[in-house]
From Swiss-Prot:
Keywords: Sporulation, Toxin, Virulence. Promotes colloidosmotic lysis by binding to the midgut epithelial cells of Coleoptera. Has moderate level of toxicity to southern corn rootworm. Belongs to the delta endotoxin family. Residues 1-33, 433-465 are annotated as: Disordered. Changing residue 289 to V: In strain: EG5144. CDD domains: delta_endotoxin_C. Residues 1-12 have a biased composition (Basic and acidic residues). GO terms for molecular function: signaling receptor binding; toxin activity. This is Pesticidal crystal protein Cry3Bb. Changing residue 624 to T: In strain: EG5144.
């Protein structure tokens, strides 16, 4: 099934607001053939100035590519870790149906997606060769999965030497074919255009290599052969990750510009490559079953931005500049949750008072830090203050999984056109009560020329097999707006995070729990949050100055988790050797020895990160527990970057 298809009842059809009672003519210039608006009457103007940039959003091929990327990440997040082995064949069948469905070609969609984003084409010879290689990979991989399914269904006592030789042969053929085909997805001059294709093929290859660790000796491979496959997997994990991050940055930097329109294209590339490439490579380390010998509970804390809510191509030149938008986006910060939005509204007059409308002119945002702090954070004010009554929506911890925003325009005979957002529906889901509801910002006045922007068009659900409130892929966590030049209106846009984020920092009783360090509720003065390198799924904690206590967390445990004890492991990069410590509410005090992994001038790459583990373990009491990370004997001006803390159950 195409993961981006939606049933008819999920599609919002926008029509002029029939509930709004107006007595004035909606199109004053259309009645007078001698009145001109840049030599067009009003109706013609509205018809011809529809935003051409929406063509990208309406491209079904691009939507299919994004939907497939989201679906693949969602499927893998649900099974990472060794329990993978128990449900492996059913996972592979679902995975195959996603990346090689019978009714579509996601690989062509991945290629077309980037062609649209950067306005370049892959040469036909390179595309044809890549597609031919992919067809061969599909055949090899399907043959292997079918053989694996038969192998697993056959009782141990009935497995023959012939069947053992056969599955080993099919595995080896598929693995070598992937290894030999990968250069076809990294052809010189087309590396950026092939990026999602490369990432998806690399992911499939690493999934396959993992099976040598799960089944290798069972299939008759020697321990030396299994070790060789393992070292190949580690080497390729680094190689594939670095390739994706490097060419993502090349592509992104190539789209930097100076105008509003340049920023929209830049942000689309950033968003769609995050969904189809960067989110995927975050998962590569989990295929190392020697490190992740249990299931894994993890989360993606990165932010992505949907398109600004802007409907008229004619007004592109009045948008804010590239730098003004990029510089006003929130800097890296501790993770927080959307609590509420205070909407300010102003009147936009139309021609001689006609076709006037109220619009979203500015806003405050209220957020809550990660569990552990009860304070509310109020954002700076964005936009223009109200001339109309202020509206405040409180989301109170519920997850907003969809927004539908309506826009309106007012046109004047002198050629000036004004834009505004008149209404936004926020669909929210309370997963504690399993209830859905909708809250609405409504400016209370529009002139009937309405277009709509639906967040689902840019952030499709993980699957269409469940209702949207269960299958959504992202949740809203921030809103900003920018003033247009020449006071032509206000442009709002939304920030989203992945649905995998756990509001409560819950430690699992049976899985390895990854807690991103940005989920802390407090930092020391010597620590800060910096932008992540692209393969961590979020931002990093950076320590540059001496500090005993670095970060404070609160974690949640159920009764089963309270019976466990946990080893603690930290993923980090460092320019020095030092000792970290982890302390909990029970006063368990664990020391972690950190080794130097990089020099001060080195860039952060996959290879600069390492894992360090405590020698002893800790337990918890009570369902809420404090946790502190600190540093001993840290020398100022050295650098340490912390990505995640992992809690590994040791007593099942």
């Amino acid at each position: 099934m195409n993961p981006n298809n939606r049933s008819e009842h999920d599609t919002i059809k926008v029509t002029p607001n029939s509930e709004l009672q107006t007595n004035h003519n909606q199109y004053p210039l259309a009645d007078n053939p001698n009145s001109t608006l840049e030599e067009l009457n009003y109706k013609e103007f509205l018809r011809m100035t529809e935003d051409s940039s929406t063509e990208v959003l309406d491209n079904s091929t691009v939507k299919d590519a994004v939907g497939t990327g989201i679906s693949v990440v969602g499927q893998i997040l649900g099974v990472v870790g060794v329990p993978f082995a128990g449900a492996l064949t059913s996972f592979y069948q679902s995975f195959l149906n996603t990346i090689w469905p019978s009714d579509a070609d996601p690989w062509k969609a991945f290629m077309a997606q980037v062609e649209v984003l950067i306005d370049k084409k892959i040469e036909e010879y390179a595309k044809s060769k890549a597609l031919a290689e992919l067809q061969g990979l599909q055949n090899n991989f399907e043959d292997y999965v079918n053989a694996l399914n038969s192998w697993k269904k056959t009782p141990l006592s009935l497995r023959s030497k012939r069947s053992q030789d056969r599955i080993r042969e099919l595995f080896s053929q598929a693995e070598s074919h992937f290894r030999n085909s990968m250069p076809s997805f990294a052809v010189s001059k087309f590396e950026v255009l092939f990026l999602p294709t490369y990432a998806q093929a690399a992911n499939t290859h690493l999934l396959l290599l993992k099976d040598a660790q799960v089944f290798g000796e069972e299939w008759g491979y020697s321990s030396e052969d299994v070790a060789e496959f393992y070292h190949r997997q580690l080497k390729l994990t680094q190689q594939y990750t670095d390739h994706c991050v490097n060419w993502y940055n090349v592509g992104l930097n190539g789209l930097r510009g100076s105008t509003y329109d340049a920023w929209v294209k830049f942000n689309r590339f950033r968003r769609e490559m995050t969904l189809t490439v960067l989110d995927l490579i975050v998962l590569f380390p989990f295929y190392d079953i020697r490190l992740y010998s249990k299931g894994v509970k993890t989360e993606l804390t990165r932010d992505i931005f949907t398109d600004p809510i802007f409907s008229l191509n004619t007004l592109q030149e009045y948008g804010p500049t590239f730098l003004s938008i990029e510089n006003s986006i929130r800097k890296p910060h501790l993770f927080d949750y959307l609590q509420g939005i205070e909407f300010h509204t102003r009147l936009q007059p139309g021609y001689f008072g006609k076709d006037s409308f109220n619009y979203w002119s500015g806003n405050y945002v209220e957020t809550r830090p990660s569990i552990g702090s009860s304070k509310t954070i109020t954002s700076p004010f964005y936009g223009d203050k109200s001339t109309e009554p202020v509206q405040k929506l409180s989301f109170d911890g519920q997850k907003v999984y969809r927004t539908i925003a309506n826009t309106d325009v007012a046109a004047w005979p002198n050629g000036k056109v004004y834009l505004g957002v008149t209404k936004v529906d926020f669909s929210q889901y309370d997963d504690q009560k399993n209830e859905t509801s909708t809250q609405t910002y409504d400016s209370k006045r529009n002139n009937g020329h309405v277009s709509a922007q639906d967040s689902i068009d840019q952030l499709p659900p993980e699957t269409t097999d469940e209702p949207l409130e269960k299958a959504y892929s992202h949740q809203l966590n921030y809103a900003e707006c920018f003033l247009m030049q020449d006071r032509r209106g206000t442009i709002p846009f939304f920030t989203w995070t992945h649905r995998s984020v756990d509001f409560f920092n819950t430690i699992d009783a049976e899985k390895i729990t990854q807690l991103p360090v940005v989920k802390a509720y407090a930092l020391s003065s010597g620590a800060s949050i910096i932008e992540g390198p692209g393969f961590t799924g979020g931002n990093l904690l950076f320590l540059k100055e001496s500090s005993n206590s670095i970060a404070k967390f609160k974690v949640t445990l159920n009764s089963a988790a309270l019976l466990q004890r946990y080893r603690v492991r930290i993923r980090y990069a460092s320019t020095t050797n030092l000792r970290l410590f982890v302390q909990n509410s029970n006063n368990d005090f664990l020391v972690i020895y950190i080794n130097k992994t990089m020099n001060k001038d080195d860039d952060l790459t996959y290879q600069t990160f390492d894992l360090a583990t405590t020698n002893s373990n800790m337990g918890f009491s009570g369902d809420k527990n404090e946790l502190i990370i600190g540093a001993e004997s840290f020398v100022s001006n050295e650098k340490i970057y912390i990505d995640k803390i992992e809690f590994i159950p040791v007593q099942l």
